[in-house]
Swiss-Prot record:
GO biological process, alphabetically ordered: cell wall organization; eisosome assembly; regulation of cell shape; regulation of fungal-type cell wall organization
PANTHER family linked to this entry: RIBOSOMAL PROTEIN S6 KINASE
Name recorded for this polypeptide: Serine/threonine-protein kinase YPK2/YKR2
Subcellular location: Cytoplasm
Regulation of this protein's activity per its record: Activated by phytosphingosine (PHS), a sphingoid long chain base. Activated by PKH2 phosphorylation. Kinase activity is regulated by TOR2 via direct phosphorylation of Ser-641 and Thr-659.
Amino acid sequence: MHSWRISKFKLGRSKEDDGSSEDENEKSWGNGLFHFHHGEKHHDGSPKNHNHEHEHHIRKINTNETLPSSLSSPKLRNDASFKNPSGIGNDNSKASERKASQSSTETQGPSSESGLMTVKVYSGKDFTLPFPITSNSTILQKLLSSGILTSSSNDASEVAAIMRQLPRYKRVDQDSAGEGLIDRAFATKFIPSSILLPGSTNSSPLLYFTIEFDNSITTISPDMGTMEQPVFNKISTFDVTRKLRFLKIDVFARIPSLLLPSKNWQQEIGEQDEVLKEILKKINTNQDIHLDSFHLPLNLKIDSAAQIRLYNHHWISLERGYGKLNITVDYKPSKNKPLSIDDFDLLKVIGKGSFGKVMQVRKKDTQKIYALKALRKAYIVSKCEVTHTLAERTVLARVDCPFIVPLKFSFQSPEKLYLVLAFINGGELFYHLQHEGRFSLARSRFYIAELLCALDSLHKLDVIYRDLKPENILLDYQGHIALCDFGLCKLNMKDNDKTDTFCGTPEYLAPEILLGQGYTKTVDWWTLGILLYEMMTGLPPYYDENVPVMYKKILQQPLLFPDGFDPAAKDLLIGLLSRDPSRRLGVNGTDEIRNHPFFKDISWKKLLLKGYIPPYKPIVKSEIDTANFDQEFTKEKPIDSVVDEYLSASIQKQFGGWTYIGDEQLGDSPSQGRSIS
């Protein structure tokens, strides 16, 4: 398990950076440390060692080796001080396409004023399943008896009333040896929306849904009722720091496998319907299934200080017709009041380094769960990282992409800087890749497509990412990717602008970086290609434990593919991994990559709406689950303490404009509050 990714600082600078000369930096930093995330490998490419905290000193390259002189004294970023890591479906929903089209035409990005949005969920109706269920009366009666059907303590009469309807809905399936089934349209009448497990006083939902806004998630479970007509009566409040245009609802079902028709029926239907085959497979392995979605349009650009009711007891029909929900949505603009650490409950430590801590926190007024990263100002100043720290905050505040971890708030105390980010708890892509060894073609394509959107959104803001690798990619609760760690980003890079800072991770360094030729945005397409190759084979294409040898391979070794490698993926990789940046796929814009045959079955508009069901869903029990984080950190007690580090007024002035609660810049002065050590 791995902890929240904490931004790493670059060792050394080039002439692009202000404040110190290269000689001064060389003297200050000496030989850097590279972070190696790959353990020793088996001959088949699968990981032998799952510990990715290996750190290797980079020796000075021998002048007799045939490598560029620019590599003789590499000025690299330092990872040593941070001990923590932080099947596309066939649904062609016209509603998804239409909403995505509307979203894609608005290029100005989200408005940035703060407020609170309250969502009240009352009930649901007309929920159905995509398959029939057994009509076995013993199984159905036992399941209903364990359910919470009404507000009364005794549901026996309700169970009896439901069971009396069974003959009316039972049918005989002539295609499966005369098995008695209940049609998919009526099956939910006989399934409770939640049940009480034996020996437990807590209910377990068989139907539930999530509400997602700006990567903040709330899970809504029913209080009572059948799956056909669940009763929720729940309220959830969201912090609004960006006025996004949609609120996303996803409905899930947790179907006991005993309810499924016979194995013969499942085999027969699976041969006819691949989608249903995958659904049945998930149920048989005790996985929740995704039933339906809805993108609720929002108009939060309201010039009013009063609370506005956006929807009043409004029935929404889910996009694929599997049910309806009754909701009310209110929005209240709020005054731009700067936050402090006292506005949060500290729940868990999820990361730690010499700079401070990363903690799971709960915002007291909305009860929303976030990741709070605390950066010690004295450490940042001592490492000459003020510019890059401010750049990271700027990128996070400006970016508008569903596949990038968004900044919710930032504030400061006299001793610290704080970033409050969406809490993404599905684990690092690195961990999942180590566990699997390699990914399937469909799974690799899905992740690369979402990453392509993330990088494109950064490039449109004239930002180069420069550090794409599995450790910097998180999975959310559904399995969508979330790019994080923007400590090596370079801002204000137009299409043809070049920079020459030597930074990154060895396995992913592009040839133009090694050659010291300067590089443009196309360096990100090289790293995207390296990552795709690693996903599909288990190792980067030029990997070697000996760093100088690996550099030689990056510059000289032909790109090799295993037998049976997908032809479209091979062609894409040849384009992305062109050593000549001027001929690299993507040099003329992201559409060059999007239009490649490798992505021919992907609707990019649907993808941006998170309209595809991810090929893998991480094991996440709830929005506060920290099981995918390193227990070395989560077992620590979160402590709010004072840091005694005095900084002069001139140094404090460097952190002016750090505060963010919905506006790009709201405050220049550090608040007088407690800080986290």
